């Protein structure tokens, strides 16, 4: 009979990130980074930019984890939304897109 360690939930990891646990942030990045890079690459079509967006996403997670509401979004969806917004912002800044506010 093998031993296995329980998988820490994403919500529990975010709670630990909010408390300053860098290892929890690393675990979230390891768990979700590949999917987030794929998402960013789909938008940007550049692997270097995609990696930058994902790094920026986890930098934002470090500071926004305490505000996360697990009743509003699953963690993976929240991470994907942060990544999507970051990728779109980068894409727009590179294309000269300007938002017009009246």
Task: Please state what every model-predicted region is.
Residues 1-12:
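Extreme N-terminal regulatory/targeting segments of RNA polymerase sigma factors
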Residues 8, 19-22, 101-102:
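Amphipathic alpha-helical segment used for protein-protein interaction
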Residues 11-14, 22, 26, 47, ...:
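Short, structured helix-loop boundary elements
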Residues 15-38:
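A short, charge-rich alpha-helical start-of-domain segment used by transcription regulators
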Residues 18, 45, 55-72, 93-95:
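Sigma70-family region 2
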Residues 38, 52-59, 63, 73-85:
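Structural recognition of an alpha-helix C-terminal capping motif at a helix-to-coil junction
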Residues 91-102:
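Short, charged, intrinsically disordered terminal tails
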């Amino acid at each position: 009979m093998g031993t296995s360690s329980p998988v820490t939930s994403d919500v529990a990891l975010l709670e630990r990130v909010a408390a300053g646990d860098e290892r929890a942030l690393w675990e979230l990045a390891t768990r979700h980074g590949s999917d987030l890079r794929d998402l960013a690459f789909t938008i940007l079509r550049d692997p270097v930019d995609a990696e930058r967006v994902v790094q920026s996403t986890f930098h934002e997670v470090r500071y926004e984890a305490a505000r996360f509401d697990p009743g509003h979004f699953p963690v993976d969806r929240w991470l994907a939304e942060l990544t999507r917004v970051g990728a779109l912002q980068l894409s727009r800044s590179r294309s000269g897109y300007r938002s017009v506010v009246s």
